Amino acid sequence: MAFLALGINHKTASVDVRERVAFTPEQLVEALQQLCRLTDSREAAILSTCNRSELYIEQDHLSADVVLRWLAEYHHLSLDELRASAYVHEDDAAVRHMMRVASGLDSLVLGEPQILGQMKSAYAVAREAGTVGPLLGRLFQATFSAAKQVRTDTAIGENPVSVAFAAVSLAKQIFSDLQRSQALLIGAGETITLVARHLHDLGVKRIVVANRTLERASLLAEQFGAHAVLLSDIPQELVHSDIVISSTASQLPILGKGAVESALKLRKHKPIFMVDIAVPRDIEPEVGELDDVYLYTVDDLHEVVAENLKSRQGAAQAAEELVNIGAEDFMVRLRELAAVDVLKAYRQQSERLRDEELQKALRMLANGSGAEDVLAQLARGLTNKLLHAPSVQLKKLSAEGRLDALAMAQELFALGEGSSDKTP
């Protein structure tokens, strides 16, 4: 068995590359099944967010290159381009990486809690696809436990910040009085929910939530006294919007340069602040060329995020130690599991030999042999049979000069100095 964690993230790839390697929710089940089928992977899961796309795989023999080729072909990328941004972690390092990701230690915003929920969703989808078995399943459970301990035992989650928080913080820097501003939020997922909460707490004058389905938009809008509209209503809402923050799972841009130009004319070129958190992008990059638009992507939030990192650096060290302990403990338990099948087979063999000797003993008793003779024969027969295979193998190893194996056998059978004198 061997674990592999492979992917790209906000530190290794630009938003342009990340959006081309992203998986939509609709793609995941089919992609997972194809991944296992074409790369000889026994178990697999895919984590795809705005900041990372990662594959977690269990194989008999690690083949990162085969997986990279599959990922490049699936997304119609050149292998060289993908290799330039990709990272690969194997076995212990893969386990540690997964735990760091789930704990928020590898996030754009250190310690952000949303990633754990996204990791749990990745696990649920892989189970639905039938690509998670006992080994990867155990790794996910250990990962969730480690992340929970980090959240509970350290201050990594205090004064919570996120990409959503960073976007709102940037808006505060641009608009001195948010209570006079109107905001248009595109999408109705977890990130937009956080944005809505932050804006509501800051007393933004009016919030509008635009979504593909009005029902989903209404559910979110009701929580914060906002208004719900459809995506088709965005052009009209743009005219009144000072702040636009977008985060959907759309594969195509939702907001184009033409629509924004029209809105700016009706606004008499009053500036609009925009943050596109989505990957792939919701807002056409050309929108940023307009004079009265301030367009930011997730990659532009780094400076805002950097300010929030300072308060979490101390907690991060303690969190890293907990992750290291969790990863080491998991690998120890996993290696112990490797012995289970051997022990089971050895026990079954021993029980078969015992039953054979027991049947001989019962026949001897039935034929009138004395109990002491039968017990002695039973003990000798069982001892000889149990020692036969090990004796043959030890002689063979000795003839081959395998002193290391002989030393291991001495340890295995507890034959250290003076062991024969000890009472069991």
Swiss-Prot record:
Keywords: NADP, Oxidoreductase, Porphyrin biosynthesis. Its EC number is 1.2.1.70. It comes from the Bacteria. Gene3D superfamilies: Glutamyl-tRNA reductase, N-terminal domain, NAD(P)-binding Rossmann-like Domain. Pathway: Porphyrin-containing compound metabolism; protoporphyrin-IX biosynthesis; 5-aminolevulinate from L-glutamyl-tRNA(Glu): step 1/2. NADP(+) binds at G187, A188, G189, E190, T191, I192. It catalyses: (S)-4-amino-5-oxopentanoate + tRNA(Glu) + NADP(+) = L-glutamyl-tRNA(Glu) + NADPH + H(+). Substrate binds at T49, C50, N51, R52, S107, E112, P113, Q114, Q118. The active site is at C50 (nucleophile). GO terms for biological process: protoporphyrinogen IX biosynthetic process from glutamate. It holds the Pfam family GlutR_dimer. Possesses an unusual extended V-shaped dimeric structure with each monomer consisting of three distinct domains arranged along a curved 'spinal' alpha-helix. The N-terminal catalytic domain specifically recognizes the glutamate moiety of the substrate. The second domain is the NADPH-binding domain, and the third C-terminal domain is responsible for dimerization. During catalysis, the active site Cys acts as a nucleophile attacking the alpha-carbonyl group of tRNA-bound glutamate with the formation of a thioester intermediate between enzyme and glutamate, and the concomitant release of tRNA(Glu). The thioester intermediate is finally reduced by direct hydride transfer from NADPH, to form the product GSA. Catalyzes the NADPH-dependent reduction of glutamyl-tRNA(Glu) to glutamate 1-semialdehyde (GSA). This is Glutamyl-tRNA reductase. It comes from Pseudomonas fluorescens (strain ATCC BAA-477 / NRRL B-23932 / Pf-5).
